[in-house]
Design a protein with these regions (language model features):
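Multi-pass membrane catalytic core of lipid/isoprenoid biosynthesis enzymes
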Residues: 7-10, 52-113
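Hydrophobic alpha-helical transmembrane segments of polytopic
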Residues: 9-12, 32-39, 100-107, 133, ...
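Interhelical loop and helix-boundary elements at the membrane-water interface
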Residues: 1-14, 51-69, 112-132, 176-191, ...
């Protein structure tokens, strides 16, 4: 019985992601964001449950990737399609450019397939994880709604499409990135992880959802600076 508990939690991730996509295409992006945050929690707890119960299985691993493809692949693509389509129509630009948003699910699929077959990624990640990429893009509607940011270059479809291409590259790039899996809580061994958590908390308290892109950028920069320590 216990071996089915992680898979059940994974299925909750999948259901939450499916409902998030429905709300995205209904232009209810705030609800979409909260549902994807819920998916991320389920994604965290299914792994936690698998480790706690020693309930690992090949089916569980594949199911996790399939659920992630929906919640952290197609869902962020749907968000960016809606955002881009609205901006393109408002600025009287070709609406077909919004389809560039679906670069996200394509590269998410590549990232997940790579993760499933890469033995290096037990203690660190190689390339940006799909949940982190989803966090980045699910914050975009909040960033665009922020009064201090609206009507800046961030509101440009060209800028957002460039972000889609750049973040998709990071998902499949051969860049070692910090994993927040702790073997112990030794300060020296986990300095980068503690720094990342501390910076994230401070930024989120100050800026709320608008902080998420900055947190992901800090994550990438801190990982690149700490590359030698991560892979050692």
């Amino acid at each position: 019985m216990k071996q089915h508990i992680p898979n059940f939690i994974t299925c909750l991730n999948l259901v939450s992601g499916c409902i998030a996509i429905v709300f995205a295409f209904q232009h209810e992006l705030e609800i979409t964001v909260y549902l994807l945050a819920l998916s991320a929690l389920f994604d965290f707890f299914d792994g936690l449950a698998a480790r706690a119960l020693n309930a690992y299985s090949v089916i569980g691993k594949d199911l996790d990737s399939l659920a992630d493809m929906v919640s952290f692949g197609f869902a962020p693509g749907a968000i960016m399609y809606i955002v881009l389509n609205d901006l393109l129509l408002a600025q009287q630009l070709p609406s077909y450019l919004a389809y560039t948003a679906f670069i996200i699910p394509v590269f998410s699929a590549l990232r997940l397939a790579k993760f499933n077959n890469d033995t290096r990624q037990s203690t660190y990640f190689v390339g940006l994880p799909t949940p982190a990429n989803t966090m980045f893009f699910m914050s975009i509607p909040f960033v665009l709604a922020h009064s201090a940011i609206n009507n800046t270059f961030v509101n440009s479809p060209a800028f957002l499409i460039s972000l889609i291409v750049l973040m998709s590259f990071f998902m499949v790039a051969e860049i070692p990135l910090i994993s927040l899996k702790f073997k112990n809580f030794d300060w020296n061994q986990n300095l980068e992880k503690f720094l990342l958590i501390g910076i994230s908390i401070i930024l989120f308290v100050i800026l709320k959802f608008v902080a998420i892109p900055l947190i992901i950028i800090c994550y990438l920069l801190l990982s690149i600076v700490s590359k030698k320590k991560i892979i050692s």
